[in-house]
Amino acid sequence: MKRRTAREKALQTLFQIDVSNIDPKEAITHALDEQESDPFFEELVFGVLEQKDKLDDMISQHLVNWKLDRIANVDRAILRLSVYEMVYQEDIPVSVSMNEAIELAKLFGDDKAPKFVNGVLSNIKNDLKQQ
């Protein structure tokens, strides 16, 4: 499975878990739709779920005039996925994670999603550089 496909499937899985609160393994089965799983895909899904509180704190610190629970579910899932990559996937350049997130926002979000996602991630990127 290509990494872009793994990210798309991970996003679909995380979105489904977030909105319907189903078991992660069931959400994975739905997202894979009889495709074979992939270690990168599973690492993204389970990594985001394990670090969700930390990721949400990081994202919340960079939301201007928004609360995390008020942003679109798909945007929230994209941000969690990308911030997880930016912080925990050291083999992936931050710029690649950001570009992939923007592409996911174009594909799955509304017209304003790419700009919103880019803005939040840019602020997080700047914070990560300072650490």
From Swiss-Prot:
Leader sequence segment: none
A Pfam family reported for this protein in Swiss-Prot or TrEMBL: NusB
Family, as annotated: Belongs to the NusB family.
GO terms, molecular function: RNA binding
Keywords linked to the UniProt accession: RNA-binding, Transcription, Transcription antitermination, Transcription regulation
Function text: Involved in transcription antitermination. Required for transcription of ribosomal RNA (rRNA) genes. Binds specifically to the boxA antiterminator sequence of the ribosomal RNA (rrn) operons.
GO BP term, example: DNA-templated transcription termination
Keyword check for Transcription: yes
Gene: nusB
InterPro entries listed in its UniProt record: NusB-like_sf (IPR035926), NusB_fam (IPR011605), NusB_RsmB_TIM44 (IPR006027)
Protein's organism: Bacillus pumilus (strain SAFR-032)
Gene3D superfamilies reported for this sequence: NusB-like
GO CC annotations, alphabetized: cytosol
Residue stretches in coiled coil: none
Protein name, entry field: Transcription antitermination protein NusB
